[in-house]
Amino acid sequence: MAVPKKRTSRSKKKIRKNVRKGKAYRAAIKAFSLAKSISTGHSKSFYCIVNDDSSGSSESKLTAIDLDDP
């Protein structure tokens, strides 16, 4: 079994910890920004398939998600 020869220094631990926290922070900012754009209706990258049952046909069309409609 591989065993480390020397103890990892505190500064190296802090650097690695801050790198991990930074990656998580950037991922959270990106997710929040994406959620905000979807909720405001300004998203250009999310589409969903909507079945149009009101006309009696089974046609489906591709439309952008609009969360303001009831």
Curated annotation (Swiss-Prot):
* GO biological process entries: translation
Record key words, sorted: Chloroplast, Plastid, Ribonucleoprotein, Ribosomal protein
Subcellular localization is given as: Plastid, Chloroplast
InterPro entries assigned: Ribosomal_bL32, Ribosomal_bL32_plant/cyanobact
Q: Which GO terms describe its molecular function?
A: structural constituent of ribosome
Q: Where is the composition biased (Polar residues)?
A: 52-61
Put simply, this protein is called Large ribosomal subunit protein bL32c
Q: Name one GO cellular component term.
A: chloroplast
Q: Does the keyword Glycoprotein apply?
A: no
The similarity annotation says: Belongs to the bacterial ribosomal protein bL32 family.
Primary gene name: rpl32
Renumbered to this chain, region (Disordered) spans 1-20, 51-70
Q: Main localisation, per the record? A: plastid
The record lists the organism as Pinus thunbergii (Japanese black pine)
